[in-house]
């Protein structure tokens, strides 16, 4: 048996699996979890793959990309995703997390897949809301959007950021789909003074890129090395990974030169 990961519309990977462990369907999402000899458990959420053995890569990168470029991280908003491991990493800071996800059926089905599921859900500083309107009106230090946002969502979310707040969103991989990344950079650049693409260095099982955006905070100039050194129980993230995440090959520097704002 095998499952197929769509990297781009024209590129696919296949992974051998031993068994299907779970199949859950809701109105808007389909979650399947498989057992794999080489990769442990693999979750397929709407045709996108999550590898249980490597969940820490994205969660550490995104959490500390924001946390280590901000002096304080008091209020965090996570939208359009299910990754509770991201919240687990963010709790290394003295922060409150608002987690917006309407699909409780699918979220609760990750109970055995996310190692810190119960720890996060039971944390007194974690608030799960079905929609943004359910939350108190406030300004955030960090907003993480786990799906590529359109301009209307960007416009709405940026109004919820503090003046020195950071907005991090998922995008297409700059090497695999550079036109999509260009468009995403342009959309964010229309609202922010800083808009820079990055990837997860040495992560070979992903087709994701990301964008760091802010009104004034810079992901490299404002990086605080002492905060990185103070982090405990991290397996992936360090200062070298942080800086390397923003490195682009010569050809992509040329492609994105009119879209990157730094």
Curated annotation (Swiss-Prot):
It comes from the Bacteria. It is an enzyme of class 2 (transferase). Its EC number is 2.5.1.16. The keyword Cytoplasm applies. Its main location: cytoplasm. Spermidine binds at residue 83. GO terms for cellular component: cytosol. Keywords: Cytoplasm, Polyamine biosynthesis, Spermidine biosynthesis, Transferase. InterPro entries: PABS, SAM-dependent_MTases_sf, Spermi_synthase, Spermidine_synt_N, Spermidine_synt_N_sf. It catalyses: S-adenosyl 3-(methylsulfanyl)propylamine + putrescine = S-methyl-5'-thioadenosine + spermidine + H(+). S-methyl-5'-thioadenosine binds at residue 29. Pathway: Amine and polyamine biosynthesis; spermidine biosynthesis; spermidine from putrescine: step 1/1. The keyword Transferase applies. One of its GO terms (molecular function) is spermidine synthase activity. GO terms for biological process: spermidine biosynthetic process. Belongs to the spermidine/spermine synthase family. This is Polyamine aminopropyltransferase.
């Amino acid at each position: 048996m095998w499952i197929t990961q769509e990297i781009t519309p024209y590129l696919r990977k296949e992974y051998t699996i031993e068994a299907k462990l779970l199949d859950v369907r809701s109105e808007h999402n389909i979650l399947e979890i498989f057992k794999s000899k080489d990769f442990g458990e693999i979750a397929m959420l709407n045709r996108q793959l999550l590898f249980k053995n490597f969940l820490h890569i994205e969660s550490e990168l995104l959490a500390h990309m924001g946390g280590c470029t901000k002096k304080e991280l008091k209020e965090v908003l996570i939208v359009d995703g299910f990754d509770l491991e991201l919240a687990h990493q963010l709790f290394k800071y003295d922060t409150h997390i608002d987690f917006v996800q309407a699909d409780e059926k699918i979220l609760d089905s990750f109970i055995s897949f996310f190692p810190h599921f119960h720890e996060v859900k039971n944390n007194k500083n974690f608030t799960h809301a079905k929609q943004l309107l359910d939350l108190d009106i406030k300004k955030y230090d960090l907003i993480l959007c786990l799906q590529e946002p359109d301009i209307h969502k960007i416009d709405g979310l940026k109004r919820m950021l503090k003046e020195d707040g950071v907005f991090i969103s998922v995008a297409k991989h700059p090497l695999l789909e550079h036109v999509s990344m260009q468009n995403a950079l342009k959309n964010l650049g229309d609202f922010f003074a800083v808009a820079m693409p990055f990837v997860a260095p040495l992560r070979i099982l992903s087709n994701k890129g990301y964008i760091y955006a802010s009104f004034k905070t810079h992901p490299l100039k404002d990086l605080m090395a002492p905060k990185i050194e103070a982090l405990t129980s991290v397996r992936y993230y360090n200062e070298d990974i942080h800086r390397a995440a923003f490195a682009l090959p010569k050809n992509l520097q040329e492609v994105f030169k009119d879209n990157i704002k730094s």
